[in-house]
UniProtKB/Swiss-Prot annotation:
EC number of the protein: 2.7.7.8
Location of the protein in the cell: Cytoplasm
Organism: Wolinella succinogenes (strain ATCC 29543 / DSM 1740 / CCUG 13145 / JCM 31913 / LMG 7466 / NCTC 11488 / FDC 602W) (Vibrio succinogenes)
UniProt protein name: Polyribonucleotide nucleotidyltransferase
InterPro entries recorded: ExoRNase_PH_dom1 (IPR001247), ExoRNase_PH_dom2 (IPR015847), ExoRNase_PH_dom2_sf (IPR036345), KH_dom (IPR004087), KH_dom_type_1 (IPR004088), KH_dom_type_1_sf (IPR036612), NA-bd_OB-fold (IPR012340), PNPase (IPR012162)
Length: 736
């Protein structure tokens, strides 16, 4: 195969792109290599088909093949099927990075597919997938010659590192994913990574300096929030690296790009004549529609106005189509919203640019749930419910680049029912948007959780009303729900969604955007954090890029909004009444590892009795003797703990090595200890048990064992064999 290979050196890694040999029937394709990882990216579109709806018909599929890591797919069916959460989130990252590149009016259904064919253990598959997809799109015949590059930045020992290894990321306090093109940033995903510091320094007491003993050593949890200036420094580094990589991509890929296809864009059917008519006759009605907070009501009002115009005498004379009228009404509405903000510095709902909508908070309103918080901000309302469980309740998952499975012990599930926006719709499995919003809230809250123990925490956010910023309402409600559940966190976390309007030299940054401003604005910028700093951020740009000056202004304006919200949340926190009666209890303690076998008992008899008697779940660690007891009743959990400790503190029974004290052929009398389906266990005179098989007891199949011998009865038996401390017995004298 004649492949054209381009090699590009980047910080901490080298990318290799192979063109022209694989997937040649696609409009664009590339075989991407980095280390031992190999990905195939392809781009296809329907040249003869255009969608009529007003959206970009772009689909991105990131697919991981189990064979890429020498694995079989998990589960009963040994074939890849439904994408996992990591695949879905990676598809979203690629989509959000490439979508702004497409021109307005592009209506050809387009699919970008990225397949992982080989995966190195320490591979950052998300950056690789985006860069592979960007290369495939660049060399395709779709006329988009914009070299998007994605990278990750970590912060290790206080220093920023571009494209860190997996091992380095395990020591990082920052996980920053940035994509951009040339000098413009397109998409940002950021979170801080918590760490635990050991405080074993000396402390000063009343009597002077005292050295810390082992019992004085404290483990201090750090959420590692970032200050705005620190984040800007990291983004400047990302921007510099992206600019260099983009230049390398242009130089390498431009000679290989296919000739531009002639693709028809959707025509602009708006009319200046209709626009002027709307301005003169319906401006007031459209402004009234803009102030409607519910999306469904606003949509109905605008449609009614369009129908009214389309049926007017002027429209009939000029032969205006309803579609042209409706599109022009939408255009006028968008420009009216933006002009109101840029010219009058106020918003459709009357707020100032930095003003947050009214907030109302209620906690623990569900009597039988472990904890809950109802967070309402304007016309956006989130009911966040917390459920606490044990280690057994954790979600098991497996990543392609990791050996074995891992456990997710903090889950945030975001649900967006259609009634939240006044619409009727299907109820089904969560979509990509719901997974993405839940993941963002999780990233914002997770660093602040202080102690896990054996606990599993699940937060479910039910969006009951939505008019923008529902994911940030989930963050606020989730932080309060954790407090209402008695979970120790370093601080409250608040989130706020920021917006941007840009026209020529003018721009306006909006705090706490509503749905209308999100739809007609140029940026969706969600930022969450504590009073100390930022814990998570997500940014999507519709402009095709964002300057650092505007980003800096947005970050500091978001800080003001976050501090305002935190003040209200702190007041609500002071009024929380924790429902101790319904919260599950957890006890973690240690016993001698050698006594674990006594807690389990023969065939698990002892531990089963404890579980049933005290209604608890028990997790035992044979290696270090750690015992975890969880249950819904605090008193029963404590009683189970005391019972286990009493067993472990008893004098250990002498365990006999039967091969040392018995020999085959020996005959003796033994007591029938227990009768089971397959025979009877006989207590041996010098310690230990032996099995007398059913075939050595009964004379025919219809005869029952307890018809021949009884528990507690002494019978004469003979040792037939000894194998690995197991004794097989026979009857010394067979009964008549």
């Amino acid at each position: 195969m004649n492949a054209t290979i381009k090699e590009i050196a980047l910080p901490n890694k080298t990318e290799t792109f192979e063109f022209g040999a694989i997937a040649k029937q696609a409009n664009g394709s590339v075989l991407y290599r980095c280390g031992k990882s190999v990905l195939l990216a392809s781009v296809c579109y329907e040249s003869d088909e255009r969608v009529k709806e007003d959206f970009l018909p772009l689909t991105v599929q990131y697919i991981e093949k189990s064979y890429a890591a020498g694995k079989f797919p998990g589960g009963f069916i040994k074939r890849e099927s439904k994408p996992g959460d990591f695949e879905t989130l990676t598809s979203r990252i690629i989509d959000r990075s490439l979508r702004p590149l497409f021109p307005k009016g592009y209506a050809h259904p387009t699919q970008i597919t990225v397949m992982v064919l080989s995966a190195q253990n320490d591979a950052d598959l998300q950056t690789m997938a985006l860069n592979a997809a960007s290369a495939a799109l660049f060399v395709s015949d779709i006329p988009l010659r914009k070299p998007v590059h994605g990278l990750r930045i970590g912060k290790i020992n206080g220093a920023l590192v571009v494209n860190p290894t997996t091992k380095e990321m395990s020591e990082s306090t920052l996980d920053l994913f940035v994509s951009g093109v040339e000098e413009d940033l397109l998409m940002i995903e950021m979170r801080t990574l918590a760490s635990d510091e050991i405080n074993n320094t000396c402390f000063v007491g009343d009597c002077g300096m005292v050295a810390a003993s082992a019992s004085d050593i404290l483990k201090i949890h750090q959420a590692n929030e970032m200050k705005e200036e620190e984040l800007l420094e990291a983004l400047e580094l990302a921007k510099t690296s992206i600019k260099k990589a983009s230049a390398c991509y242009v130089e390498a890929f431009t000679p290989l790009a296919k000739p531009d296809a002639i693709l028809e864009l959707k025509p602009d059917i708006t009319s200046s004549e209709i626009y002027q008519y709307i301005k003169e006759n319906h401006a007031i009605a459209i402004k009234e529609a803009i102030t409607r907070m519910a999306k469904s009501e606003r949509h109905s009002d605008l449609k009614r106005i369009a129908k009214e115009i389309a049926s007017s005498e002027r429209a009939q004379e000029s032969e205006w189509s309803f579609e042209a009228v409706y599109e022009t009404v939408g255009k006028y509405k968008r420009e009216a919203v933006r002009a109101l903000i840029l010219e009058e510095r106020r918003r459709a709902d009357g707020r100032g640019l930095k003003e947050v909508r009214p907030i109302d908070i209620q906690t623990n309103i569900l009597p039988n749930a472990h904890a809950s918080a109802l967070f309402t901000r304007g016309e956006t309302q989130a009911l966040v419910v917390a459920t606490l469980g044990g280690d057994m309740d954790a979600q098991s998952y497996e990543l392609l680049t990791e050996k074995g499975s891992s456990k997710e012990r903090f889950m945030v599930h975001y649900n967006f029912p259609s009634f939240s926006v006044g619409e009727a719709g299907m109820v089904g499995a969560p979509g990509r948007r719901e997974l993405g919003h839940g993941n963002l809230a999780k990233r914002a809250l997770e660093p602040t959780i202080e102690e896990w123990g054996a606990q599993t925490i699940r937060l479910v956010s039910e969006i009951l009303e939505s008019n923008g910023s529902s994911s940030m309402a989930t963050v606020c409600g989730g932080s309060l729900a954790l407090k209402a559940a008695g979970i120790n966190t370093t601080a409250l976390v608040a989130g706020v969604a920021m917006g941007l309007i840009v026209e020529a030299e003018k721009h306006a940054i909006l705090t706490d955007i509503m749905g209308l401003e999100d739809h007609d604005g140029d940026m969706d910028f969600k930022i969450a954090g504590t009073s100390t700093g930022i814990t998570a951020m997500q940014m999507d740009i519709k402009l095709g890029g964002l300057s650092m000056e505007i980003l800096k202004e947005a970050l500091y304006q978001a800080k003001e909004g976050r501090e305002h919200i935190l003040g209200i949340m702190e007041k609500a926190q002071s009024e929380i009444i924790i429902n101790d009666e319904i919260l599950p209890s957890l006890q973690i303690f240690s016993i001698n590892p050698g006594r674990i076998v006594d807690i389990i008992g023969q065939a698990g008899k002892t531990i089963k009795e404890i579980i049933e008697r005290f209604e608890v779940a028990i997790d035992l660690n044979r290696d270090n003797g750690e015992v975890k007891v969880t249950g819904s009743n605090k008193q029963k959990v404590e009683a189970a703990k005391e019972h286990i400790l009493s067993i472990s503190n008893q004098e250990a029974p002498q365990r006999v090595r039967v091969a040392d004290v018995y020999s085959a052929g020996e005959v003796f009398k033994g007591k029938v200890k227990k009768i089971v389906d397959f025979g009877a266990f006989i207590e041996l005179p010098k310690g230990g048990d032996g099995l007398l098989h059913v075939s050595k007891i009964v004379q025919h199949r219809d005869q029952r064992i307890d018809e021949v011998i009884k528990e507690g009865e002494e019978i004469e038996v003979q040792i037939l064999s000894i194998n690995k401390n197991k004794v097989e017995l026979g009857r010394a004298t067979r009964p008549n």
